[in-house]
Amino acid sequence: DAINSPVTCCYTLTSKKISMQRLMSYRRVTSSKCPKEAVIFKTIAGKEICAEPKXXWVQDSISHLDKKNQXPKP
């Protein structure tokens, strides 16, 4: 239930580019309960890293993950 799920907020955003090969998934933080919007990348190692959604490498990584995670069409 989205109403009762805990909200994860990012208070510090990395400025360091993360290699696309290390990324497994992402989710956007857009809750009004959070001080800033962010993208949380989950790495293959299981770490969660907050990033600035407007940064060019973040947008490139998101589109890379979207393409990678699309199920092949029959």
UniProtKB/Swiss-Prot annotation:
Protease in keyword set: no
Pfam families: IL8
GO cellular component, as recorded: extracellular space
Cystine residue pairs: 9-34, 10-50
Keyword Iron set for record: no
Span of the signal peptide: none
Domain of life: Eukaryota
GO biological process: antimicrobial humoral immune response mediated by antimicrobial peptide; chemokine-mediated signaling pathway; eosinophil chemotaxis; inflammatory response; positive regulation of cell migration
Keywords: Chemotaxis, Cytokine, Disulfide bond, Heparin-binding
Post-translation changes: The N-terminus is blocked.
Matching Gene3D superfamilies: 2.40.50.40
Molecular function terms from GO: CCR chemokine receptor binding; chemokine activity; heparin binding
Function: Chemotactic factor that attracts monocytes, but not neutrophils. Augments monocyte anti-tumor activity. Also induces the release of gelatinase B. This protein can bind heparin.
Family named by the database record: Belongs to the intercrine beta (chemokine CC) family.
Name of protein: Monocyte chemotactic protein 1B
